[in-house]
Amino acid sequence: MKLGIVGLPNVGKSTLFNSLTKAGAESANYPFCTIDPNVGVVTVPDERLKLLGDFYHSKKVTPAVIEFVDIAGLVKGASKGEGLGNQFLANIREVDAIVHVVRCFEDSNVIHVDGSIDPIRDIETINLELIFSDLEILERRIAKVTKTARMDKEAAKELDFLQKVKTHLEDGKMAITMEMENEDEEAWMSTYNLLTWKLSLIHISEPTR
C-alpha cells in the first residue's frame, strides 16, 4: 500500500514522515521545506508471520510493507498553479490513500501560511483543492464521452454518471461520500483515479513526550 502524507505547508508532514520511517527527511520552520516528494518504506509487524512460516516450513517470510510519500504542502489555489501547484496534486494521485496532517497546536514560533490556527478551515482548504483538481479530470472525461454518447448506450450511461459525480463535487462533497448504485458505477469510478475517491485519514496530534 502507498500512503501520501498531505496538508498545508509547515504543519508537520515531514516530521510525521520521519517519525514513521526514520528516514531523516529535512524538516524546517518555513513553507515548502519539502519540494520533491520524500519516500520511505516501512514493514508491518505481524506476529502471525513467524507462526505461519514455522507451520509451512517456509524458507523465507516476507512481511507486508507500507510506502509513505511525504508530499509538498498544498495551498489555496494549488489546482490553478498557486504555491507549488499541480505537480504535487499529481503526486497525490499516485497513492492509494491519503494521510491528511492538520495543525491544531498553538506556537508563535511556527509559521502558519494563513496566519492563524483553524483546523476546520485548513481541512476545507485541502479538500477544496482536491475537489477542483478532480473536477478538471471529470470535465475532460465528459468531453471525451460526449462525443460517443449519442451512438453508444454504455457511453450515454457513463455520461449520466459523470454528470452526477460532477454535481456531487460542485456541492463541495468528496467523491468517496457518494453511494454507488451498481457495479457499472463502481467500475467507472475506479478508472477515474479521483483524489476525492481515495480513503483518507486525518492526523491532528501526537502525544507529548
Where do the protein language model's features map onto the residues?
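Residues immediately flanking
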Residues: 71, 104, 206
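Residue-level detector of conserved catalytic or cofactor/ligand-binding positions
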Residues: 202-208
